[in-house]
């Protein structure tokens, strides 16, 4: 049950970020906000894309 819930959440996230992804995503080391999911890698740690 946990797995399917996780993938559903992930899918929803990807849907929500598709627009910003298609315009431009930030590279590794770029400053980012965890809430905006704007990194190419998808991971934002300590204010930087990982």
Swiss-Prot record:
Changing residue 27 to A: Decrease in ability to inhibit Cav2.2/CACNA1B. One of its GO terms (cellular component) is extracellular region. One of its GO terms (molecular function) is calcium channel regulator activity. The record marks 27, 33, 35 as: Key residue for inhibiting Cav2.2/CACNA1B. Residues 2-24 form a propeptide. Residues 1 form the signal peptide. Changing residue 36 to M: No change in ability to inhibit Cav2.2/CACNA1B. Expressed by the venom duct. Disulfide bonds join 25-40, 32-44, 39-49. It comes from the Eukaryota. It is found in: Secreted. Changing residue 30 to A: Small increase in ability to inhibit Cav2.2/CACNA1B. The modification Cysteine amide is found at residue 49. Keywords: Amidation, Calcium channel impairing toxin, Disulfide bond, Ion channel impairing toxin, Knottin, Neurotoxin, Secreted, Signal, Toxin, Voltage-gated calcium channel impairing toxin. InterPro entries: Conotoxin_omega-typ_CS. Changing residue 33 to S: Small increase in ability to inhibit Cav2.2/CACNA1B. Belongs to the conotoxin O1 superfamily. Shows very weak activity on Cav2.1/CACNA1A (27.36% current inhibition at 10 uM) and Cav1.1/CACNA1S (2.82% current inhibition at 10 uM), and no activity on sodium (Nav) and potassium (Kv) channels in rat DRG neurons. The presence of a 'disulfide through disulfide knot' structurally defines this protein as a knottin. The cysteine framework is VI/VII (C-C-CC-C-C). Omega-conotoxins act at presynaptic membranes, they bind and block voltage-gated calcium channels (Cav). This toxin selectively and potently inhibits depolarization-activated rat Cav2.2/CACNA1B currents (IC(50)=89 nM), when coexpressed with alpha-2/delta-1 (CACNA2D1) and beta-3 (CACNB3) subunits. In vivo, is lethal to fish and displays potent analgesic activity in mice pain models of hot plate and acetic acid writhing but has fewer side effects on mouse motor function and lower toxicity in goldfish. This is Omega-conotoxin Bu8.
């Amino acid at each position: 049950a946990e797995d399917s819930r996780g993938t559903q959440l992930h899918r929803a996230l990807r849907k929500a970020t598709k627009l910003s992804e298609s315009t431009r995503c930030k590279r590794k080391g770029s400053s980012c906000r965890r809430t905006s999911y704007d990194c190419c890698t998808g991971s934002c740690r300590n204010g930087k894309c990982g």
